[in-house]
């Protein structure tokens, strides 16, 4: 039997190509999320954490270190719903405030766990809930569908990419 590049490429997967495709998918969905409006980004995060939260949190090693964000989380609990929404929008828009700087110093995994906690509190009515009449854009729905097509590890990478860039890192401000 003779081997050609055609016969071997159909029989054996190329781990280098699949890695490129994987990183391209993650980068593509991350870019799609970043292009959404602030409120669509927040809605997408809320949906992902409420629908996939049980899968996301155990996979985020920083969840055990959420006590590092406890002070900021307690401040958020004490805010009015309007102030909470402003804070979340400020995070997404990287507005420089004391609270967004406090978030900015958290580790990537602690930021993942932080957003999970916010989603839990939204579900419990402690943090401003998703408005009942909120209607996400077509782009947000398409982005959510693209995110759903990724495997769990890729989804967590996309979420990490998004939450890492939120807030203001005081070391780089």
Regions found by a protein language model. Give the residues of each.
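Short amphipathic alpha-helical interaction elements located at domain edges
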Residues: 2-173
């Amino acid at each position: 039997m003779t081997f050609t590049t055609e016969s071997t490429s159909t029989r054996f997967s190329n781990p280098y190509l699949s890695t490129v495709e994987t990183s391209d998918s993650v980068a593509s969905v991350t870019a799609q999320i970043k292009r959404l409006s602030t409120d669509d980004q927040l809605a997408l995060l809320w949906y992902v954490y409420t629908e996939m939260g049980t899968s996301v949190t155990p996979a985020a090693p920083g969840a055990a270190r959420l006590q590092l964000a406890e002070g900021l989380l307690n401040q958020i609990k004490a805010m009015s719903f309007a102030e909470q929404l402003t804070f979340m929008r400020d995070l997404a828009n990287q507005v420089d405030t004391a609270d967004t700087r406090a978030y900015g110093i958290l580790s990537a995994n602690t930021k993942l766990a932080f957003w999970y906690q916010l989603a839990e509190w939204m579900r419990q009515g402690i943090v401003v809930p998703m408005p009942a009449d909120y209607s996400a854009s077509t782009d947000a729905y398409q982005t959510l569908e693209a995110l759903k097509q990724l495997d769990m590890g890729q989804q967590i990478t996309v979420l990490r990419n998004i939450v890492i860039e939120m807030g203001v890192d005081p070391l780089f401000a």
